[in-house]
């Protein structure tokens, strides 16, 4: 699995969202690399890990990343948050957890109202088989929908998407399956690590209320909402997200 290592200082592991790669975090790298050693992962089937054979399943990916990185704070965005949360619940070397626009369950249920309908991910999977590039572009648009900086964020995501080659279609389907079926809520009550939950006020994929609900279930958790932020708040609101991460990490024991 490809992992870029940039900067010096306490280690952070950064995990990207569906269809993208570690390069998407460039605005955070610019702000955090002077203070931290950043481990930027390309998940299997994505970016420079296009041909990596690690199954895109939580235990396999987390074990591989943990074996290749030092003790660190794990930061997960969107789909990457599922891997980060699983790591925080199972890997002793995870110092703390930061979730950006991510929750333990992405689909709505009778006891989990602040999420999207399961059919959203099912439809993307069906569309992907018929129109690969068009479906990816529609998903990127959903990432930025509602953001105060939607236009510039969408341009950035489009430029980033294929900068390291196109993601593997099989990995995209596996990722949609994780978003559709994963439910890690039971891990929250016993989460021993401190956690930070950063929501976008205007996020249409992961409502801020859902992130605050998740944080309320975890001990040692804090949550904040980025005003005007969409599903990728670290793009248009990079200063606020970087500052929140910096304050969180600086306060760790």
UniProtKB/Swiss-Prot annotation:
InterPro entries recorded: AB_hydrolase_1 (IPR000073), AB_hydrolase_fold (IPR029058), AB_hydrolase_sf (IPR050266), BioH (IPR010076)
Location of this chain's protein in the cell: Cytoplasm
EC numbers on record: 3.1.1.85
GO cellular component: cytoplasm; membrane
Main location: cytoplasm
One record GO biological process: biotin biosynthetic process
Pfam family name, one: Abhydrolase_1
Residues that coordinate or bind substrate: 18, 78-79, 139-143, 231
GO molecular function: pimelyl-[acyl-carrier protein] methyl ester esterase activity
Keywords assigned: Biotin biosynthesis, Cytoplasm, Hydrolase, Serine esterase
This protein's pathway: Cofactor biosynthesis; biotin biosynthesis
Entry superkingdom: Bacteria
Active-site residues, record numbering mapped to chain: 78 (nucleophile), 203, 231
UniProt catalytic activity: 6-carboxyhexanoyl-[ACP] methyl ester + H2O = 6-carboxyhexanoyl-[ACP] + methanol + H(+)
Alphabetical list of HAMAP family matching this protein: Carboxylester
Subunit: Monomer.
Biological function: The physiological role of BioH is to remove the methyl group introduced by BioC when the pimeloyl moiety is complete. It allows to synthesize pimeloyl-ACP via the fatty acid synthetic pathway through the hydrolysis of the ester bonds of pimeloyl-ACP esters.
PANTHER family the record matches: AB HYDROLASE SUPERFAMILY PROTEIN YCLE (PTHR43798:SF31), MONOACYLGLYCEROL LIPASE (PTHR43798)
Family affiliation: Belongs to the AB hydrolase superfamily. Carboxylesterase BioH family.
Protein name: Pimeloyl-[acyl-carrier protein] methyl ester esterase
